[in-house]
Amino acid sequence: MADYLKTEGFAHYNDFSLPHLGPLFLLDSRVGYCRENCDIATYVMRAVGIPISMDFYEIAPSYNRKHFWSALIDTTHLVVPFNYEEEPMSRKPRPNERKRGKVYRICYGVQPERIKGIFEDKCVPPLFRHPFLKDVTNEYFPDSRVTVELDRTSKDGKAYLSIFSIGQLRAIAITEVKGNRADFDFVEPDVSYFPSCMIEGKNVSAGYAFTLKNNAPDYFIPDTTSLVDVTLYRKYPMRSNVKNLGNTCGLKIEGADTYDFMKPELLYEVVDTPKVNYNILKVNPKKKYRYIRYSAPKDKFIELAEWRMYAENISQPITPQNITADHPLSELHRKNLDLMDDNDWVSFYMSEVVGEQLIFDLGKPYKLDHILFMPRNDDNFIHLGDSYELFYHAGAQGWISLGKRMAEDTELHYDNVPEGALLWLHNYTRGEEERAFYMKQGKQVFL
């Protein structure tokens, strides 16, 4: 049934903010975000007697968004999570599967209070006051539990298990404090968490962050007596950027005297995946050329965020007189050529066909010196000219600053980082996608 639903298609669109839509509308209009996708599966499968639910996590351990998926209620008392648009159903965990942390399900009946009086306690985050919300993490991780040490507690006697997202702690589980400890049942292993509590209406750190391994917390405890040098390239996990950058391997840049490129000179070839988005390609042509050709690999689309060519002894980029392709461009694609030179590092030109060649007519011959080349990316690399601040997590003290930096290159350097610390790089200039990370063998490892 899931395979059949996939053949009927679904258009992903994240800008909706609507209540659940009815089955007749969704069966006719297959559009929405992950929740609508799950609603379709629920309507169809329940109609033919297949017991499924829709589960979700409120805060993602690895992303900034809430996420829904379908869950088949199995005879093993565990669920089989799936999304019919993504991959076939499987009981086996998938590689690179999204981390969940804690899993919840909206039910039709009022659920028992986790803590007596919690539904009426306005000091508790709304997630835990939802009377129809059920914690079903036990159906995913039935044997995973953790006891954490608390260096700070609140007067209400409650503690939270939190995820650090968009610059703040977001609670995903609640429990009652026992002395200076807190027990949390059914939490996903190999995920990093922050113990926290409510102080004056704000969710604040109550101890050291940790990764759950073998039902025990592996704490990030910074050693302030041992400082190390670090080099930072990003503020957020790579995700699909690895693929986007890798798609440029094999592209060629050539120069020629004539539009037909009867006698081209190879100026540059990308032979390895770029490490960052902002790349200066030094070229050393034998002579001046009027025409420059950008050739994508035969099996790849052009996905180009920024492209500027600079001639010797000229500080301003060359403005091409005309840009054409090796095939007729549609009106939309001709218009989108401007995205390669709009100073927006997220927008990008995407070719209509794989293996496309773009030809830049410079108007007259120039001897090129270098090219600014920026593939499609998420702009979470170090952005030149932006203001950054690096923090380390100090348990109940929260985040401690290690200093501000103005980015003058594609990397930031700090020589005062406590060994073993959990870090957070904040960009004051733009964006909200930021995640905590630690250093391992000189490289950033994001949580």
Model-derived regions, located:
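Hydrophobic beta-strand segments
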Residues: 159-164, 253, 307, 371, ...
